[in-house]
From Swiss-Prot:
GO terms for cellular component: cytosolic large ribosomal subunit. GO terms for biological process: translation. InterPro entries: Ribo_uL30_ferredoxin-like_sf, Ribosomal_uL30_bac-type, Ribosomal_uL30_CS, Ribosomal_uL30_ferredoxin-like. Belongs to the universal ribosomal protein uL30 family. The gene is rpmD. Keywords: Ribonucleoprotein, Ribosomal protein. This is Large ribosomal subunit protein uL30.
Length: 60
């Protein structure tokens, strides 16, 4: 299955609690931290909810 790399590029400080929880649930902590996750509907939905805070790249 395909994988995606998610990088936290903006701070969740001052954002809604749901958005902050989504950042933590994805395993992102500090700015510029990255995680590699499976590309599925659940992860894509989480990324869409915080798309203004993260960047997404395909991993080959």
């Amino acid at each position: 299955m395909a994988q995606i790399k998610i990088t936290l590029t903006k701070s969740p400080i001052g954002r809604k609690p749901e958005q902050r929880k989504t950042v933590v649930a994805l395993g992102l902590g500090k700015l510029n931290s990255s995680v590699i996750k499976e590309d599925n509907a659940a992860i894509r939905g989480m990324v869409t909810a915080i798309s203004h805070l993260v960047t997404v790249e395909d991993v080959k």
